[in-house]
């Protein structure tokens, strides 16, 4: 077996190594690891009111700043090909933009008097779930990008955030404080009622989905350092089984890989921050230390 790998950009050498690993892995008929070649996109704070949007490889060896100047937060890939992404520019009137990573072309999508975040993209990439607070409280909205049509999905008087598609985009899960503490709920897109989805933990404040699987963040008891632990758990809409994915530290911002076989997340343990990857089908996990800067949010 032989193949030549080359690039005109020295900074992209890590992707050559990833390509070599993927090809060798496929040649040996081992489980596919195509996720190695995908970009990670994240928002990193520079100061209290300034953050950049950066793309990187999963080891963070390659990094390139795409958006800078002002407070740029909550990047979310707009397509599986990773050519475009959504992000929020938090200025006097928070605005959601769609940007091409290669051309830099930007398109204004929506703006709001309060918070606005694109949290998930439909499988056909035509619709997005948006957390928005046009008045006081946040609710979940469905926005058709092609038709420019906005539909409000939740109307609770408290906090509804972090909407994600499940079950072939027919339902959504979201985080709400409607029972007091934050927890994960589900509802059909075309129906009003919502049901509690997670019966484990007292403070479940974030979630990500793939198909009928949900990974959520649960705040738990304090660890040896005196800090609260935030652990990741996986559940399915089809069973009652709960799978623990982490057991120590502060584990947050989980995101499924495009094939659903891996999850990326941020881990804080003591004074060390790392980007973590869990291979769900193989009980393998990896940590890649963050050298500097606090990450605001991440997508894969």
Give the ranges of each region predicted by the language model.
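Amphipathic beta-strand/beta-sheet edge segments enriched in Tyr/Trp
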Residues: 1-21
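Residue-level detector of Asp-centered blade-edge/turn motifs that repeat once per structural unit
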Residues: 31, 35-36, 79-81, 123-124, ...
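An edge-strand/N-cap motif at the start of beta-rich repeat modules
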Residues: 33-56, 63
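Residue position within the beta-strands of beta-propeller blades
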Residues: 41-44, 84-88, 127-131, 171-175, ...
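Short, solvent-exposed loop/turn segments at conserved positions within beta-propeller repeat blades
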Residues: 46-49, 90-93, 133-138, 177-182, ...
């Amino acid at each position: 077996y032989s193949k030549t790998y080359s690039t005109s950009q020295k900074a992209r050498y890590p992707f050559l190594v990833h390509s070599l690993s993927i090809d060798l892995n496929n040649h040996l008929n081992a489980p596919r690891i195509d996720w190695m070649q995908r970009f990670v996109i994240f928002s990193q704070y520079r100061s209290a009111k300034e953050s950049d949007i950066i793309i990187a490889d999963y080891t963070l060896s390659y990094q390139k700043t795409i958006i800078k100047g002002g407070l740029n937060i909550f990047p979310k890939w707009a397509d599986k090909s990773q050519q475009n992404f959504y992000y929020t520019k938090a200025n006097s009137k928070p605005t959601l933009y769609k940007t091409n990573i290669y051309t830099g072309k930007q398109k204004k999508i929506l703006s709001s008097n309060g918070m606005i975040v694109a949290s998930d993209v439909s499988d056909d990439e035509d619709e997005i779930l948006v957390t928005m607070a046009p008045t006081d409280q946040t609710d979940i909205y469905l926005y058709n990008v092609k038709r420019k049509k906005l539909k409000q999905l939740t109307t609770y008087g408290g906090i509804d955030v972090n909407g994600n598609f499940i079950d072939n985009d027919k339902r959504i899960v979201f985080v709400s404080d409607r029972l007091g503490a934050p927890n994960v709920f589900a509802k059909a897109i075309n129906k009003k009622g919502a049901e509690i989805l997670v019966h484990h933990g007292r403070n479940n404040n974030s979630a990500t989905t793939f198909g009928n699987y949900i990974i959520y963040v649960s705040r738990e008891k304090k660890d040896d350092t005196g800090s609260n632990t935030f652990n990741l758990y996986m559940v399915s809409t089809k069973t009652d089984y709960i799978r623990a994915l982490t057991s120590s530290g502060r584990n947050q911002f989980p995101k499924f890989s495009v094939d659903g076989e891996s999850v990326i997340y941020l881990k804080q343990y003591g004074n060390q921050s790392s980007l973590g990857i869990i291979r769900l089908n193989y009980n393998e996990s990896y940590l890649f230390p963050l050298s500097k800067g606090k990450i605001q949010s991440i997508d894969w």
